[in-house]
Amino acid sequence: MLYIIRQILQPLLAMIMSLNMMIFPVTEDRVPEEMDQVQNVIYLIGDGMGPLHLEKAKQERNISLVMETFEYSGRSMTRSQFNAVTDSAAGATALACGVRTINGYVGVFYYDPLCVESTPRNLTELCIEKGMMTGIVTTDKTSGATPSGFSVHTDSRNNTKDIDTQQMNSDIDLIWGATSSYISQETCEANGFTFVKTYSEMMALEEGGCSFAQFDNGTWYTEQYDDETPTLSQMTTKAIDLLDDTDEGFFLMVEGAHIDKNSHDNEDAGMTEAVEEFDNAVAVALEYAKNDGNTLIVVTADHETGGIVLNDDGTYSFTQGSHSGANVPLFVYGSDTFIENGEVVYNIDIPARIAYSLGFDKDDMPYERFADWVNVVVENVAK
């Protein structure tokens, strides 16, 4: 019976997919014809970080920001497939896979959330196929929306067990963040990962192995939460040290998740501290890139949270506890061709430009990976 249903549905789904591509055609080419080539990429995402988050942090903490010293800066537009305001899952999918999807979906096409026909390939997978080392570092739990966008394909950001399972079955060299429900030392080691729980265990890691970290939820502070919980900048430093171990280069995604989390609660002190520590991680990346000379740094956000506004008295304040549709910052170091100063780009263009900077063809990102049965149907139709 299942065989009969499969035979009926497969050609129908293939036809729907073809019609969809005609109704929603691929957008015009928005990747520059010439792109400076690099070996490594450090992609830093400040979750919920709008331009006024930066101004508020500078004002209230009396600091300057390393990211604002980058030679090139612009803005990114953040909408999802059907919403002017994206969530973190769709935002991560755009930044990782170069496609728009529905809020709540992670790493899937909006018209095929169960991956029946095809899935979009993310930057991490693309780099693994090239032989590069890859890593994901976050202050969120490892199954959070942003790290999930760079590591899994699922129809809901709340599918924690599915996300944890896909990550543990992946070929990513390191996945570090806060504790997620279904991750354990036994499951990690069974899948070839060294299980890491503390700062000292992280620092003891040596090149050549894979690691899965489950830290306490205090990694976003500017100072160590306790002796055994690293900060985001410390994680970034160690991750770069471990990934810089191959002639093929590396790809590292670093997320500062607590800019968003504190903005949802309109917590001024927490949000500004999270911005400062995220910028500390940017400083780590910049120091490495300056010494290396062959590394691209891209700093941006998935969306803005809190609707921060400038008041008449020159201060900044939150106006809401949810996401907004505001454009977000985009800073670039290590390429004279990635963006023009002041350029406004679609969020889905950023991973395409990253891929092109790494030497991939324009057709490689976004890339539609078809299920085996779709290829068979297409081949039969062609005959």
Walk through the language-model features, giving the residues of each.
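Functional beta-strand-loop-alpha-helix junction segments that form "active/interaction loops"
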Residues: 196-236
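Sec-dependent N-terminal signal peptides of Gram-positive bacterial secreted proteins and lipoproteins
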Residues: 3-25
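Gly/Ser/Thr-rich active-site loops/lids in small-molecule metabolic enzymes
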Residues: 270-288, 317-328, 332
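Short coil/turn segments at beta-strand junctions that form active-site/ligand-binding loops
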Residues: 39-40, 132, 248-249, 293-295
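Active-site His/acidic residue clusters
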Residues: 145-151, 218-226, 236-240, 244-286
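Metal-dependent active-site segment of extracytoplasmic phospho-/sulfohydrolases and closely related
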Residues: 51, 276-314
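Structural motif
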Residues: 43, 213-215, 251-255, 298
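N-terminal catalytic scaffold of extracellular/periplasmic and nuclease hydrolases
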Residues: 24-180, 184-202, 206-210, 304-383
